[in-house]
Amino acid sequence: MDPRSEVLLRQPELFQGSLLLVGLPADDLLGKLPNARGWCWHAGDQAALDARFEGRVDFGVEAPEATFEAAVLFLPKARDLTDYLLNALASRLAGRELFLVGEKRGGIEAAAKQLSPFGRARKLDSARHCQLWQVTVENAPQAVTLESLARPYQIELQDGPLTVISLPGVFSHGRLDRGSALLLENIDKLPSGNLLDFGCGAGVLGAAVKRRYPHNDVVMLDVDAFATASSRLTLAANGLEAQVVTGDGIDAAPMGLNTILSNPPFHVGVHTDYMATENLLKKARQHLKSGGELRLVANNFLRYQPLIEEHVGYCHVKAQGNGFKIYSAKRS
């Protein structure tokens, strides 16, 4: 069981009423708290929880409509996402209890200060390298809309400026990261047809490619509902259309692709996790047509080239700079 869940279960009497678990891990916590429901935005966690606790977890970027007497927020990595979630919860919990649990290395001590606008926060427990904080909501805020927290920015491309709409919690929120910038300089001569933007984030790559190659059918895929919500806003801001899918890794992608384009993630929360990218590299061949291309950008220190050659085909470095490399391989 996740150590954050174990910390909650050290004081189970606090969590016996109608409870909303927000950003909960895919463990057995719901089985221990029969009156609790979950709210999740990670497609992989959602699938795992649905398989065990069908009908007890809501998925998406907005708080569920069902009433709850208390809520526990599992601290996310991004401070701005924490602010959005705390606001969404506190606005519904006037006079009631709001809890925050997280790992010490994830910044729980500092994040606890984000409870102070709602009332006097206090630390209830510290164990398993985690902390549990609580506040009685004395100052319930007005709920803010997610879109009001978006950070739009523009990037200059060969065919003109592209507007990107970035939501809280999305990778490289409010700015273009160096890896994507390098890949955007190298989206020439992509195969025509069906293209997948894997790990689409705010939709920078997918939108840029759709505008440059308008006859291509573009699918944008991410495991995170905040990312796919951002991608839809980015497409709309530029008058573009593409299919946006929230799904768990390459298994959620269509078959018969001509191109897979990616700036793949290797972090989940505060943890390093290469599984999604390694799974992409191992299974890309199944999703690509013969002659289809995998083109991705990665940090120099990530040794993806041997894995690509083993599972896709001959791989070469198309470009490099600022600590990143672009790998290109065509399915033989």
UniProtKB/Swiss-Prot annotation:
Protein name, as recorded: Ribosomal RNA small subunit methyltransferase C
Presence of the UniProt keyword Transferase in the record: yes
Subunit-level organization: Monomer.
Gene Ontology molecular function: 16S rRNA (guanine(1207)-N(2))-methyltransferase activity
Transmembrane portions of the chain: none
Its job: Specifically methylates the guanine in position 1207 of 16S rRNA in the 30S particle.
InterPro entries documented for this protein: Mtase_sm_N, rRNA_ssu_MeTfrase_C, RsmC/RlmG, SAM-dependent_MTases_sf, Small_mtfrase_dom
Pfam family membership, one: MTS_N
Swiss-Prot/TrEMBL catalytic activity: guanosine(1207) in 16S rRNA + S-adenosyl-L-methionine = N(2)-methylguanosine(1207) in 16S rRNA + S-adenosyl-L-homocysteine + H(+)
Keywords (A to Z) from UniProt: Cytoplasm, Methyltransferase, rRNA processing, S-adenosyl-L-methionine, Transferase
Intracellular or extracellular location(s): Cytoplasm
One GO cellular component, as annotated: cytoplasm
Family from the record: Belongs to the methyltransferase superfamily. RsmC family.
EC number: 2.1.1.172
Species annotation: Pseudomonas syringae pv. tomato (strain ATCC BAA-871 / DC3000)
Organism ancestry: Bacteria, Pseudomonadati, Pseudomonadota, Gammaproteobacteria, Pseudomonadales
